[in-house]
Amino acid sequence: MTIKNFTFFSPNSTEFPVGSNNDGKLYMMLTGMDYRTIRRKDWSSPLNTALNVQYTNTSIIAGGRYFELLNETVALKGDSVNYIHANIDLTQTANPVSLSAETANNSNGVDINNGSGVLKVCFDIVTTSGTGVTSTKPIVQTSTLDSISVNDMTVSGSIDVPVQTLTVEAGNGLQLQLTKKNNDLVIVRFFGSVSNIQKGWNMSGTWVDRPFRPAAVQSLVGHFAGRDTSFHIDINPNGSITWWGANIDKTPIATRGNGSYFIK
């Protein structure tokens, strides 16, 4: 076997033995792209004239292939949501890239660097009335990476993380509603009415499921509804729950409150 297609070694000192397919894969690897995502930069703003959009000076990378739209006009459908696609067909050697306005996002994820076919990638959503453009929404530019390490980060939008929920019948009337954000933070809501419990007892009900268990003991404080008194519980690494409030007899006392802890 032979390792080929170096980008760092030129046997003739005049050119790299790398083809366009290899170059396309390099772009995608460096930016965390897949075949349904794009990179786009408008060097000047597109112009909307009646039922047309003109890309005056826009750079796009799709499928690892870089191209420029210079005064490229797309005809739009009236009273519609127009999904603007870049279509890359490498068999059309004279004009391998075309633009189309379609009625849905028809991005198809075709791997043009390792196989064949026409790659379609949506990069703009343009809404029209009967006479002109009413709104434009560029497709979000997405990267998929295994890990990121940064010194500083500023976020102007939202951060979406996986969310799991769990209700625990802790026993003795106490109930916990757990909401886990990512694999880091658990938010706990106390509810239910507690009875027949003494300080230091392990509660008699269900233990916390393994995915919600902390690495170290976590102490959470709640309060008794309508009273000026509080209590706390320990959630232990094995999932058991220990009561550290006052001793309570058979008369139930309603609980309320919220707490949180980090799993790790």
Curated annotation (Swiss-Prot):
Gene Ontology cellular-component annotations: virus tail, baseplate
GO biological processes: cell adhesion; entry receptor-mediated virion attachment to host cell; symbiont entry into host cell; virion attachment to host cell
Keyword Transmembrane helix: no
Source taxon at top rank: Viruses
Xref: InterPro entries: Adenovirus_pIV-like_att, Caudo_bapla_N, Caudo_bapla_RBP, Caudo_bapla_RBP_neck
Keyword set, alphabetical order: Host-virus interaction, Viral attachment to host cell, Viral attachment to host entry receptor, Viral baseplate protein, Viral tail protein, Virion, Virus entry into host cell
Pfam families: Caudo_bapla_N, Caudo_bapla_RBP, Caudo_bapla_RBP_neck
Family classification: Belongs to the skunalikevirus receptor binding protein family.
Quaternary assembly: Homotrimer; found as an assembly of 6 homotrimers. Interacts with host phosphopolysaccharides; this allows the virus to bind the external cell wall layer. Interacts with the distal tail protein.
Protein name: Receptor binding protein
Organism: Lactococcus phage p2
Species lineage: Viruses, Duplodnaviria, Heunggongvirae, Uroviricota, Caudoviricetes
Encoding gene per record: rbp
